[in-house]
A protein has these predicted regions:
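Active-site beta-strand termini and strand-to-loop segments that position acidic
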Residues: 61-63, 153-156
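A short beta-loop-alpha structural element at the N-terminal edge
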Residues: 3-18, 27
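A short helix-loop-beta-strand connector motif used in the catalytic cores of GNAT acetyltransferases and
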Residues: 45-59
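Conserved GNAT-fold acetyl-CoA-binding loop/helix
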Residues: 24-46
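Conserved beta-strand-loop-alpha-helix junction that forms the acyl-donor binding cleft
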Residues: 118-133, 137, 145-150, 154
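Conserved acetyl-CoA binding element of GNAT-fold acetyltransferases
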Residues: 83-94
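Conserved acetyl-CoA-binding loop-helix of GNAT-fold acetyltransferases
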Residues: 92, 98-111
């Protein structure tokens, strides 16, 4: 399945928010995410993706049909290198996992923003860790290092 990344426009903010809610719900099995009294998982930086030039959000879509398959949220807030990018949030709808959608979307993110990257897999999620380890290893031909469970690499 061929996929594309589509930059999320402010007019599509509600769609991204709904997808993010699903992702945060899914992650809550492994981290400290809690719903508030309105049944919303709060995400303090969400609005910043539409006003801050250091943050970008993309929908992952099937190229042929334009079907929505997931999303990626990227920022430039890195801790182990002087400058670069990081995947803040990343989710592929479960039905489309295990058929290269996530891998291809991640690689497209890396290709859009050449240079230094830090990838922080979800806490306590072996599945997320394995996914990112496989993607980073393949993309970098093994040329990355692991710093306290954070994948760090540079690809120009």
């Amino acid at each position: 399945m061929e996929i594309i990344l589509e930059k999320v426009e402010i007019s599509q903010k509600d769609i991204l928010f709904r997808l993010l809610q699903y992702s945060l719900f899914e992650e809550s099995l492994n981290d400290q995410n809690e719903m508030n009294n309105e049944a919303i998982f709060e995400y303090e930086w969400f609005e910043n993706y539409f006003i801050d030039t250091d943050r970008e959000a993309y929908f992952i879509r099937e190229k042929r049909t334009n079907k929505l398959l997931g999303f990626a949220m990227i920022n430039t807030y890195v801790q182990r290198v002087n400058s670069g990018h990081s995947i803040a949030e990343f989710m592929v709808i479960p039905k489309y996992r295990r058929n290269q959608v996530g891998k291809n979307a991640a690689i497209q993110c890396f290709e859009k923003h050449k240079g230094n990257w830090e990838i922080y897999p979800s806490y306590d999620s072996e599945q997320a860790y394995q996914f990112w380890e496989n993607v980073v290893r393949e993309y970098t031909d093994g040329n990355y290092h692991l710093d306290q469970a954070v994948f760090v690499f540079c690809k120009e």
